């Protein structure tokens, strides 16, 4: 295992490499060409290339967490006459519904429950009876449960019905192969501190340029105006409208180099997938059960039912694991008592093996 205080087994922020951390030791000037052209513009080009080889796409970086970018897209992509169908089966789909409500955006929330895969036929039926829907928005990897949602099938519906398609790929982009043009995605949203394995500080949107250009004057926010941010970066060669998170950006540039060195998204996906499978097999051997069936799991994070033993307390389990150098995630499912373990970031097979040994030691309720 790499040198660290402890291993973050979370869906981001996550454990980063020493070299990603070291990239932040340099101070950059936000108006300097070495930074804007040499770093920011290179990142924008690399992100677009990771998303698709098709022409007509661009990328925008935005200060803040991933939710800032989700709100920027919803607040900029939808005009007063538009309506969005939000497919929700977890906390992050529900957050989009909340955002739309607060911004006064017309929306239809299709909530299929936290442990159910969205029913594509039901989505088809909603689109068929409501022609006022102009946009579809959904989460790809719903980290509430660890479920991977069917963005390909919903994308086919968006294309067939002529709807603008927004995908929150926060914890999947860079870790799961995808071609956003083939998936008919118009806006893909992700964050620096997820599968690219950078650190928190900014999010990004990869968008169909024609769609983004139509957002002029629509934003319901000054700071979260996606069109204005894009035009500033386009017109000023990587310049951010407001203070750029320079150290985070330098870390992200290094993280992109390390993604390429690993073998790209396909190789990283293979590592994540093997991590997750080994984790589930080991946890089941220790007596834990997964919340979801195997075919629903993403290779990003897994939810496990909490032990039914009356002595079990998550806080104590967490403390004992942290003492051994491992940090896991509490549950977020409303109807079940669970905890979650992520396996993305600078996490390898040996780390999963060591984690399982630590979990066995931390199972105080079995002793």
Curated annotation (Swiss-Prot):
<feature type="modified residue" description="N6-(pyridoxal phosphate)lysine">
    <location>
        <position position="194"/>
    </location>
</feature>
<comment type="function">
    <text>Involved in phosphonate degradation.</text>
</comment>
<keyword id="KW-0663">Pyridoxal phosphate</keyword>
<keyword id="KW-0670">Pyruvate</keyword>
<comment type="similarity">
    <text>Belongs to the class-V pyridoxal-phosphate-dependent aminotransferase family. PhnW subfamily.</text>
</comment>
<dbReference type="InterPro" id="IPR015424">
    <property type="entry name" value="PyrdxlP-dep_Trfase"/>
</dbReference>
<keyword id="KW-0032">Aminotransferase</keyword>
<protein>
    <recommendedName>
        <fullName>2-aminoethylphosphonate--pyruvate transaminase</fullName>
        <ecNumber>2.6.1.37</ecNumber>
    </recommendedName>
</protein>
<dbReference type="InterPro" id="IPR015421">
    <property type="entry name" value="PyrdxlP-dep_Trfase_major"/>
</dbReference>
<comment type="subunit">
    <text>Homodimer.</text>
</comment>
<dbReference type="InterPro" id="IPR024169">
    <property type="entry name" value="SP_NH2Trfase/AEP_transaminase"/>
</dbReference>
<dbReference type="InterPro" id="IPR012703">
    <property type="entry name" value="NH2EtPonate_pyrv_transaminase"/>
</dbReference>
<dbReference type="InterPro" id="IPR015422">
    <property type="entry name" value="PyrdxlP-dep_Trfase_small"/>
</dbReference>
<dbReference type="InterPro" id="IPR000192">
    <property type="entry name" value="Aminotrans_V_dom"/>
</dbReference>
<dbReference type="Pfam" id="PF00266">
    <property type="entry name" value="Aminotran_5"/>
</dbReference>
<dbReference type="GO" id="GO:0019700">
    <property type="term" value="P:organic phosphonate catabolic process"/>
</dbReference>
<keyword id="KW-0808">Transferase</keyword>
<dbReference type="GO" id="GO:0047304">
    <property type="term" value="F:2-aminoethylphosphonate-pyruvate transaminase activity"/>
</dbReference>
């Amino acid at each position: 295992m790499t040198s660290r205080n402890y291993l973050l087994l979370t869906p981001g922020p996550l454990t980063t490499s020493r070299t990603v951390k070291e990239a932040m030791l340099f101070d950059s000037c936000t108006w300097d060409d070495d930074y804007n052209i040499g770093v920011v513009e290179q990142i924008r080009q690399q992100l677009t290339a990771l998303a698709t080889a098709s022409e007509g796409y661009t990328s925008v970086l935005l200060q803040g967490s991933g939710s800032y970018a989700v709100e920027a897209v919803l607040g900029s992509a939808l005009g007063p006459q538009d309506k969005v169908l939000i497919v929700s089966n977890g906390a992050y789909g529900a957050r989009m519904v909340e955002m739309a409500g607060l911004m006064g955006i017309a929306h239809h929330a299709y909530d299929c429950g936290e442990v159910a895969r969205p029913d594509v036929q039901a989505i088809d039926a909603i689109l068929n009876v409501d022609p006022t829907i102009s946009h579809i928005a959904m989460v790809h990897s719903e980290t509430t449960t660890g479920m991977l949602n069917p963005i390909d099938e919903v994308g086919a519906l968006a294309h067939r019905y002529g709807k603008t398609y927004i995908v929150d790929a926060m914890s999947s982009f860079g870790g799961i192969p995808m071609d956003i043009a083939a998936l008919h995605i118009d806006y893909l949203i992700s964050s620096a501190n997820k599968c690219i394995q950078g650190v928190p500080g900014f999010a990004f949107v990869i968008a169909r340029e024609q769609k983004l250009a139509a957002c002029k004057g629509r934003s319901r926010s000054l700071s979260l105006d996606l069109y204005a941010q894009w035009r500033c970066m386009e017109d000023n060669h990587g310049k951010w409208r407001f203070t750029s998170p320079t150290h985070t950006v330098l870390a992200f540039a290094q993280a992109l180099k390390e993604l390429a060195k690993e073998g790209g998204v396909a190789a990283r996906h293979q590592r994540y997938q093997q991590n997750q499978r080994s984790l589930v097999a080991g946890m089941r051997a220790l007596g834990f059960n997964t919340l979801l069936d195997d075919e629903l799991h993403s290779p990003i994070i897994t939810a496990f039912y909490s032990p039914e033993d009356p002595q079990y307390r998550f806080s104590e389990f967490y403390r004992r694991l942290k003492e051994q150098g491992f940090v896991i995630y509490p549950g977020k499912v409303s109807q079940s008592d669970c905890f979650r373990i992520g396996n993305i970031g600078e996490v390898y097979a040996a780390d999963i093996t060591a984690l399982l040994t630590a979990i066995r030691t931390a199972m105080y309720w079995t002793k």
